[in-house]
């Protein structure tokens, strides 16, 4: 199960300063909406920085992943099987922080702009982590590494169901989009 296999590397890759900032802006009684929650990696990672009373809204389109994620916060997690095409369906009432991990690089520019507008309109902070940036380092380096990276980046830019994804350009584009929507981007 690749989500479990990658979680230790994902956890190590998260910026500790941004995690602390996300926990702070979530407030003393946090209610976190996690988009594309998968098995609950963000809940497990960010949850360690939040009070035990933190409540979670876990959003994914895969009921099996939602069921697994909900076991991480028994009695404090509500699962929502939603299609992320419909951002108006997001349960934002009472939420103090919205999160997304390893998601923005799978989304098109228009979706990220719509998300930024929706969250700005609701006055909600956003913590995004683990967006692929197109850089790979190989050991040992081999002559075809550049070709493999290029092919992977092309695949990342493919349509994942909502239009052509930003892939390796997601972090830069999302930062610009959220800044333009009035967010402080760190």
Features from the language model and the residues they span:
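Short amphipathic alpha-helix with an adjacent loop that forms part of the alpha/beta core around
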Residues: 86-94
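Class I SAM-dependent methyltransferase Rossmann-like catalytic core
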Residues: 1-26
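A short, conserved alpha-helix within the catalytic core of class I
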Residues: 106-119
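Conserved class I S-adenosyl-L-methionine
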Residues: 29-38
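A conserved beta-strand element that flanks and buttresses the S-adenosyl-L-methionine
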Residues: 99
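Class I SAM-dependent methyltransferase SAM/SAH-binding core
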Residues: 43-87
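Conserved catalytic/acceptor-binding region of the Class I
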Residues: 124-186
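Short catalytic micro-motifs in class I SAM-dependent methyltransferases
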Residues: 102-103
């Amino acid at each position: 199960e690749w989500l479990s296999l990658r979680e230790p590397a994902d956890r190590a890759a998260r910026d500790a300063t941004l995690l602390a900032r996300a926990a702070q802006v979530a407030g003393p009684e946090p209610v976190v909406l996690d988009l594309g929650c998968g098995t609950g990696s963000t809940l497990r990672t960010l949850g360690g920085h939040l009070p035990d009373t933190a409540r979670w809204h876990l959003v994914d389109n895969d009921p099996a992943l939602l069921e697994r994620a909900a076991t991480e916060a028994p009695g404090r997690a509500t699962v929502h099987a939603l299609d992320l095409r419909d951002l108006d369906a997001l349960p934002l009432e009472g939420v103090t922080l919205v999160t997304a991990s390893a998601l923005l690089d799978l989304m098109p520019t228009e979706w990220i702009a719509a998300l930024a507008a929706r969250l700005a309109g609701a006055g909600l902070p956003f913590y995004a982590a683990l967006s692929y940036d197109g850089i790979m380092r190989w050991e040992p380096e081999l002559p075809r590494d550049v070709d493999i990276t290029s092919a992977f980046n092309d695949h990342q830019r493919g349509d994942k169901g909502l239009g052509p994804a930003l892939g390796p350009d997601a972090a830069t584009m999302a930062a610009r989009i959220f800044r333009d929507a009035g967010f402080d981007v760190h």
